[in-house]
Amino acid sequence: MSRIGKKPVVIPSGVTINVAAGNKVEVKGAKATLSKAFSTDVTFSVADNVATITPNNNSKNAVAQSGTARAILSNMVEGVSKGFERKLKIIGVGYRAKAQGNELNLTLGFSHPVVYKLPQGITAETPAPTEIILKGADKELLGKVASEIREYRKPEPYKGKGVRYEDEYVAKKEAKKK
């Protein structure tokens, strides 16, 4: 059986988990409410502030789904209680970002500013013009948004200009010499 799937998910105080028909799980907390439909190969049980996921049979797929479901449920519980944060850095002359409500204005060297509309549940802060802090309860959506913003101008390998994750290392190349 999956090693991750065997571990129970500890539910902190202030967080409730409801399992509806069709394996639709809803997690409510102080920061948000998240819901997700899981595979029917797994069964959820919640008792005494602990949630456990068990595969319905011993097939390879059911065991794999139990580990996946446990990891996703753990992220949902952490998201509604603490929330997640992703930091992006912008490197380059004239490259800037500015958060305005649910939009992010990016100046990335194009002939026009890029306006990225943030999805519901994700907020952006720009403490400095070259820093973006994305916050949200849904880890999957937060990663998707950060990836889409990075896609506008990926870090290039010669000068390192572009949008990168805060902890990302960009291997630099040496320019060709004549």
Swiss-Prot record:
PROSITE patterns: RIBOSOMAL_L6_1. Transmembrane segments: none annotated. This protein binds to the 23S rRNA, and is important in its secondary structure. It is located near the subunit interface in the base of the L7/L12 stalk, and near the tRNA binding site of the peptidyltransferase center. Gene3D superfamilies: Ribosomal protein L6, alpha-beta domain. One of its GO terms (cellular component) is cytosolic large ribosomal subunit. This is Large ribosomal subunit protein uL6. The lineage of its organism: Bacteria, Pseudomonadati, Pseudomonadota, Gammaproteobacteria, Thiotrichales. Part of the 50S ribosomal subunit. Belongs to the universal ribosomal protein uL6 family. It holds the Pfam family Ribosomal_L6. GO terms for biological process: cytoplasmic translation. HAMAP family: Ribosomal_uL6_B. GO terms for molecular function: rRNA binding; structural constituent of ribosome. Keywords: Ribonucleoprotein, Ribosomal protein, RNA-binding, rRNA-binding.
